[in-house]
Amino acid sequence: KREETGIYEMKNEERRIMQEIQFIVPAALHDEMLRLRNEKQMDFLESLTGMDWGVADEKDAPEKLRGLGVVYHLESTVTGERIALKTAVTDRERPEIPSVSDIWKIADFYEREVFDYYGIVFVGHPDMRRLYLRNDWVGYPMRKDNDPEKDNPLCMTNEETFDTTQEIELNPDGTIKNREMKLFGEEEYVVNIGPQHPATHGVMRFRVSLEGEIIRKIDANCGYIHRGIEKMNESLTYPQTLALTDRLDYLGAHQNRHALCMCIEKAMGIEVSDRVKYIRTIMDELQRIDSHLLFYSALAMDLGALTAFFYGFRDREKILDIFEETCGGRLIMNYNTIGGVQADLHPNFVKRVKEFIPYMRGIIHEYHDIFTGNIIAQSRMKGVGVLSREDAISFGCTGGTGRASGWACDVRKRIPYGVYDKVDFQEIVYTEGDCFARYLVRMDEIMESLKIIEQLIDNIPEGPYQEKMKPIIRVPEGSYYAAVEGSRGEFGVFLESQGDKMPYRLHYRATGLPLVAAIDTICRGAKIADLIAIGGTLDYVVPD
C-alpha cells in the first residue's frame, strides 16, 4: 500500500523481493525517518546501501534517477511491516544527505561506510571518518567515474594513526560546519588490541581507552582485511559473483550463497525444485552446527578451557567430512548455483547425516559438563557484557546476539524460505542479554538444527538438482532484496540491475558489522578481560 509520503510499504510475503522503492527528497528525509520510527514503529534499520546512479544525461527519461544516494530498508519489530525508500543528490562535488544516526545507532557505521565508498557527507553525523580504507586514500572507489588504481598506487608504508574526526553540523542559515573532534583526550590511556591479537579472531584492531582496568571507550578499525568484493562484483557476471560469497563469513558459506542465489532466482522468476529446497535447508543447518561448534571451541580457548576447545573441533570434523564428500570442499564449498546446486547429493550423504544426528545428541552433554557448568566459565560470562533488547534492535544485532537479548529476529520464523515452513523447530530466545545468554542460545540452536535436519533427511523428494539456465544470465531491471538466517544473524543481499549480465550494484548486509558496531556500547564499564569474553560471544567473523 502507499502512504501519503509516496513510500512503498511491503507486505510480508514480499519480504524477499521488491522492485519498487520510492524516492524521498533529502530535505524531508530526516523528518520522515523520525516519523516512521515514532509513528510506524520502524525500529530496525535493516540495511543502508550507498548508490551511484550516474550523471544526468539529456537522453534520460524524466523518471530516470541520477546522482549519489542511499537506499534504506526498515522494519518494525512490533508489526512486522517493512518499508524501503531511497534518496539522492545530483551535486557530486559536495553531496550532502541528512544523517539518521540519531535515530538508529547502527547508522553510525553504515553512514561511515557510504562516506568511505561514495564521499557522501551525512549532515549531523558525529564521527564522519572512513570506515575501511586508509585515511590517505584518494577518491571514493564505488563511484562509477572513479579509477582507484590511477590515484592510489601500491602503498608499502604504515598508515598514520589519527586521533581526530569530523562532526558535521547544520548551521541555522543552512550552511554546513565541520567541527573537529578528538577521539581520545590527552590524559586518556589508550592501548591497542589487535590487529594481530588471537582474541580478535582475525585482523581486527580495537583502540581501547582505559581507566585502570575499566574500559571507557573503544574505537574499532575493521578495514585490515577489506578486499573490495562489492566493487569486484560490478565487473563479474552473475554466476561469477557466487564465488565470492563463500569467502565473506567463511563459517556461513552455504547460507551466504543461498541468499544470493535466492535473490537472483526470485528476480528472474525461477522456481527451484523441492529437492533443491530440501538440500539447501539441510546444508544451511549443517553449516549452522559447524559454525556453533567452532564458536564453542574458540570461546573456550579464549577463556582458558583448552580441553573444551578440542571437543568442538573433533565433532566439527564430522560435518566437514560430509561437506567434502558432496561439495568437494570443507570450508569454501561453492555448492549453491543459480537454479539449484552444483551436484546431486553423494550416495553416502543421507546415511552419514543420520549417523551424525544421534551421535551429536548423545555427546552434547559432555560440552556442558566440561564448560557450561564450570564455575570459572560462568563467572566470566554471567552478568558480563549486557546488551539490552532496545540496543540490540537499534544496532541491528540479529542472530544469536539479538535473541539472547529477547529479540525474536529469526528470518526462518519471520519470513520462511527453503522448507522452513514445513518443519517444527523452536526459536531460542533468552532475555538476560549477557555473554552467558549469547553462549546458551548457540548451544541450544545446535539441538534445534539437529531437529530440523532429522525431519527432512528421510523426506528429500526426487527431482532435478539444477534447473536449465540460459548460457548468459540477465536479471530484469529493478531493485531486489533477499535474506537468510545465517550462523551469525540476518545475511541480506541487495541487488540493483539494469538488465545487463553484470549487476549494477550488489550489496551485502553483513551479519558481523552490527556486532562490531555494538562493542563500544557493550564494553563501557567492563574490565579489559571482559572484552575477550564479549568479543567471543558476539561471534563476529572479520572478513564478513
Model-derived features with residue positions:
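Terminal low-complexity/charged segments
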Residues: 1-214, 291, 373-379, 383-384, ...
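Active-site bordering "gate/hinge" segments
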Residues: 135, 168-201, 209-544
